[in-house]
Structure formats: structure tokens, C-alpha cells
Amino acid sequence: MLGNITSELDKLSPRFEVEPSQIRILRSPGEFYETLKISTIRDALQRNPELKVSILTDALRGTRETPKPCCASLLVPLVEEFGENRVEIRMFHTPNLTGLRKKVVPKRINEGWGLQHMKLYAIDDELIMSGANLSTDYFTNRQDRYHVFSSAALTDYFERIHQAVCKLSFSILPSKELAGYTMEWRQDNPGPSPLLDPKAFNAQATASLNSLLHLATLAEKKPPTTSTLVYPLLQFTPLLRPDTSTELPALRTILSALSTPAFAESSWTFTAGYFNMTPEVRSLLLNSHPAHATVISASPWANGFFGSKGVSGMLPAAYSLLSRRFLDAVSSKGLASQITLKEWRRGTVNEPGGWTYHAKGLWVTMPHETEPSISLVGSSNYTKRSYSLDLEANALIVTRDQSLKKRLREEEQWLQEYARPVDRDEFAKTERRVGLHVRVAMWLVTVLGGAL
């Protein structure tokens, strides 16, 4: 049965065979920090003169607080101390926010026009796939997912993706200016800056990335020799003309298969911290008619924007509105007894003991089984932004191994420890009602070409 799905995935993406023991699933922000130990980068550079470090982040997020301390100003001392030949700091800038639009859109929400959103952490032959950034809360009180892959081939593939996007990004270099850094477009970058010529930038990006996304043809793939396969899935819609991204087509392949008779009585769990799945993803989930299914989202009190000032402070209410609309769709399809929406809350954000929820992904369990055989982990939130404006990286695990399936089931369960079911009555409560100003703000963002 899994072969029906993998045969279609083989047409879309490279495939890597791994042993189940090569995949480790981390549970908590603290465990993520202890595994990554990002604070040791400087120490490692000092101890090993042969070590080289390459960091790719987003230009809009990474410079937002300038001239106050920001990602760019915090990282650039590494370049100053160890030199450009050993430390490379790159920041990707979307081609969708330029000129007058960039000047008028507030910095706090300008990421709604596109980000470098991939979360990849590679050291030697190990790779961590996650949805987590490297800010303090992701190491302390922000729940996410973290999978460690001990595979040289898989790590090398994502390193090639990383380097290709680096060459389509600005370099961050030391400067005596107040900000402490300068953002430069290197002459050896293969194309022009996205701020100067977005169209030519896209043409070069397509030439650089398209072949990497589709390294192996179906004819080159032999029957797998292990119980576990990993498919790298990438969504580079803002860069590719035409769009040959692989994440959305793969998700479409899996969810469409679930709606066929062969997969009747399958089940799934879907989660996204920011609950704004596209209409297509919502339809695919609902049309799968699962035996049972769970959707996990952040409650407003576990949303990172809760209590923010200005337009961003409206986002928790906007996501509540979208959750209510999802339940309306579930009800109209007659699936209320099969699909449960749960909201995750652990205290209240910005209060002592309060956490935020940022996990995202999919688990699929085959008919008449109790543990998932398929899991998708990575950066995507499955939103309009993910599929039109952001750069996303994910790993799709397909396994027949019972021990790995058990670990995936445990992950699926522990993410629900702080989640409770909500129904349509919940959204009728006074504190959950959404004002007209929120609806207008949602409409305005769309009109200006952005997305939640």
C-alpha cells in the first residue's frame, strides 16, 4: 500500500534510504538546544582552524531591529574575528518586496511578503530538520518539532540547497556604521540583486535551483533496500519560473491517495502553529474521509503574537476566525464525529510559565494500523505564504519499521499533552469573537500582496 504512494513520490523528488536508527526524534526545546549547542560555534572555530561555518537567515527578519541589536549585528562579529574565508553570513531577501511597497509596509509585518523560512542545521554528517529558529524562546518555552538525521547523503543534499540559496543572498559584513554591519550583494553572485532587478533575479534562481530539486529521475531509482525512505521536499515558489517546487505536489499526492478506496479507514494528525491552511489543503484533508483525525493548532494564548502592539496583535484573533471557519467546513461535510480540532495551550505567552506553540507537520496511519507510517517534518505552515511567498524545506519520512513507527506515534501523542478539543461553541464565547477591524486588516494584507 505504501508502494502506491512512494512510486508517485519517486517522480517528484530525490529519495534517500536510511536506517531507522539514523533518525532521532527530539522532544523539547531544551533537548534541541543541547543537541545543537549553537553557543559553541565560536569555541569550535577557535579550537579548529580548519572549520568553516555558513549561516543563512532572512534579511527582513534578520535586520528588523536595526540599529538596535538584531540577528545581523549579533552574527557579524564572527566574520570580524575569523574572517570571510571561514565564516559566511548570508541573508536572503524576497524579490516580492521592493521599491515603494517596501517603504510603506511596516517592518513588524513585512515578512508577510516572503521569507527565507527554511530551518536546517547541519554539522558534518548530521542534519536537524525543524520548524524552530535559534532565538531564545525556541530553546526554552516554544514547542516545535526536531528530527535528527544521521545520513551523510541526505545532509550533503541539503548542504547543496543551502549553498545555492546563499549565492542568491546578501553577504553580511562588518562595518563601522551605527548598525555594526553592512549588507552587500557580492560581485560573484550569479545574478543581480532582487532589489534591483527581480525578474532577472528569478531567472537566475530558476537556473540555479531547478536541477537540484529534481536530481534523480525515476529511471535512475532502484527498488529500495531499506524499510525507511526520506524525501526532501522544497517549496521555492517565489524563485522558480515555472514553479517546480516539490512540497505541495507531494502533499497533494499523499492526501489524494487517502481519499481512494485502498486507503479507506486511514487516519491522520495535522498540526500548524499558525492555523491558516490553504483552501486546497483543507479540501484534501476533508475529502480523505478518515476513520479519525486530529488537527492541532495554537490557542490565542499560545500564539507568539499574543499581546503584540499594532497590526501583528490582531493575528491571534485572525487565526481564531480561520479555526472557526475550518470547524464550519467540517460540520458541513458531516465529519464532526471523525475530525477533532484541538488547541494547544501551556500557560499564557509573556507570563511566567507561559509557552508558545510552533509545531507543524503531518502523520498518516495506514488502515487498521495504530502507528503512523508517514510523517512530514520541516518549516512549512501549509499556508498561502508557504506556497506562494516563502522558501520552505521539509523531510517526508515513509517507513515500514515498527520501532520508528512507534517513535513517530509517541511524538504525535506528546504534542497533544497540552491540547484540548474545541468545538464551534468555543468560538461563540465573548473572548473569542473577532471584530470587524481584524477582518479588515486580513483583507488589507491580501490586497497589498501579502499573506498570513
Model-assigned labels for residue ranges:
Residues 1-30, 184-254:
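Active-site cores of enzymes that catalyze phosphoryl transfer or operate on phosphate-rich substrates
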Residues 1-127, 132, 136-141, 146-156, ...:
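PLD/PLD-like phosphodiesterase catalytic module centered on the HKD motif
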Residues 103-110, 123, 129-130, 157-215:
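Extended catalytic-interface subdomain
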Residues 107, 255-256:
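A generic local structural motif
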Residues 154, 242-254, 260, 273, ...:
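Short, contiguous, pocket-lining structural segments
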Residues 174-181, 225, 421-429:
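Short glycine-rich, low-complexity/disordered patches
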